[in-house]
């Protein structure tokens, strides 16, 4: 995660999207899905795949979508994940799909966000919170 641009408190979220995961695009930027190729801010351990969770910034490529977006490396934010995680109040939460939005390296979203967004992501990235329809 790019700590210089992210604001708010940092949450412990179960990491559900390893490198190589394909997630739906939750915005109207023209991409249909995003293929995770790297996770920002992961130090890691030898032979362990870096994984992303809700609120993490990832480097991704577009596998389906507009031709001008494909075959380029872009940055994205994970806004929903299927893997459950536990919140501080004891509630386990998960979504029905893995989804992310395309953004610039500062965390500013390129399009409008479709569908719900996790509270952990909206607290960390204020530009996501302003564009989100519903925050869960």
Swiss-Prot record:
Q: Which Pfam families match?
A: Ribosomal_L14
Keyword list (alphabetical) reads:
Ribonucleoprotein, Ribosomal protein
**What Gene Ontology molecular function terms does this protein carry?**
large ribosomal subunit rRNA binding; structural constituent of ribosome
What are the GO BP annotations of this UniProt entry? translation
For this record, an example GO cellular component is: cytosolic large ribosomal subunit
**At the top level of its lineage, which domain of life is listed?**
Eukaryota
Q: Which family does it belong to?
A: Belongs to the universal ribosomal protein uL14 family.
Which HAMAP family is this protein grouped with? Ribosomal_uL14 (MF_01367)
What name appears for this protein in its UniProt entry? Large ribosomal subunit protein uL14
Q: What is the lineage of its organism?
A: Eukaryota, Amoebozoa, Evosea, Eumycetozoa, Dictyostelia
Record gene name: rpl23
């Amino acid at each position: 995660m790019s700590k210089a641009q992210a604001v708010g408190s940092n949450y412990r979220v179960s990491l559900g999207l390893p490198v190589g995961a394909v997630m739906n695009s939750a915005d109207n930027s023209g991409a249909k899905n995003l293929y995770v190729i790297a996770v920002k801010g992961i130090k890691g351990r030898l032979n362990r795949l870096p994984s992303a969770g809700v609120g993490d910034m990832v480097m991704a490529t577009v596998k389906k979508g507009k031709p001008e977006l494909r075959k380029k490396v872009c940055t994205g934010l994970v806004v929903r994940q299927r893997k459950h995680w536990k919140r501080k109040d004891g509630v386990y939460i998960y979504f029905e799909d893995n989804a992310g939005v395309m953004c610039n390296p500062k965390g500013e979203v390129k399009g409008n966000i479709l569908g719900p967004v996790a509270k952990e992501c909206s607290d960390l990235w204020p530009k996501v919170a302003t564009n989100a329809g519903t925050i869960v």
